[in-house]
């Protein structure tokens, strides 16, 4: 397969995987989904540029109204709502984690530890952006809320599940990367 055709296929498949993982949901104020697992796996398999395009496509599909977000939601309101910052934060996760993975792989130091460090740092950026977004929008629409309350609602419950997803994504990337490179 030609490189550009192969890239387009992988980007489309990754976007589809992101959509499917958004539908695997445990309802909560900020829903528990498998999106972050898909995000970490996409970054690990595709690298920064292609992963960024895939996540942009995912967000664009949702923004135009297709029900690709958790709870079968879509529309610009999903992105601009109080929890939309976490979705937009996925783009920052791609940039941070993908760049770090690239640096580690150039130095031949892309181990499970460096993979996890790259993903955790990207996730922290996503948490920070999403939390700040939530705090600003919630405060403007409803009234004052403390940072601790937002963290308790939107971040703390997700830390352990996200760490498990990072470990699981490393395993999946390790299994699939060698096969994808052969295509």
How should these model regions be labeled?
Residues 1-54, 64:
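Hydrophobic transmembrane alpha-helices
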Residues 1-4, 29-30, 71-72, 76, ...:
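Helix-boundary and loop/linker segments of multi-pass membrane transporters
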Residues 8-13, 37, 41, 52-57, ...:
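Hydrophobic alpha-helical transmembrane segments
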Residues 13, 56-60, 84, 92, ...:
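Hydrophobic residues within alpha-helical transmembrane segments
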Residues 13, 20, 76-128:
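Short helix-perturbing small/polar motifs within transmembrane alpha-helices
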Residues 17, 21, 25, 42, ...:
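Alpha-helical membrane-inserting segments
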Residues 22-32, 59-93:
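Interfacial aromatic-anchored transmembrane helix boundaries in multi-pass membrane proteins
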Residues 109-183:
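Membrane-embedded alpha-helical hairpins and interfacial helices in multi-pass inner-membrane proteins
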């Amino acid at each position: 397969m030609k490189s550009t055709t192969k890239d387009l296929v992988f980007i489309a498949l990754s976007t589809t995987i992101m959509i499917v993982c958004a539908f695997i949901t445990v309802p909560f104020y900020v829903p528990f989904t498998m999106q972050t697992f898909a995000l970490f796996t996409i970054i690990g398999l595709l690298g920064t540029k292609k992963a960024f395009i895939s996540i942009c496509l995912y967000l664009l599909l949702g923004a135009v109204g297709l029900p690709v977000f958790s709870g079968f939601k879509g529309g610009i309101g999903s992105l601009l709502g109080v929890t939309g910052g976490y979705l937009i934060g996925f783009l920052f996760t791609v940039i941070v984690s993908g760049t770090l993975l690239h640096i580690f792989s150039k130095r031949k130091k892309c181990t499970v530890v460096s993979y996890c460090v790259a993903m955790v740092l990207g996730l922290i950026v996503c948490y920070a952006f999403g939390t700040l977004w939530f705090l600003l929008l919630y405060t403007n629409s409803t009234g004052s809320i403390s940072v601790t309350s937002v963290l308790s609602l939107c971040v703390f419950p997700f830390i352990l599940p996200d760490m498990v997803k990072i470990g699981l994504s490393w395993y999946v990337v390790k299994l699939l990367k060698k096969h994808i490179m052969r295509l």
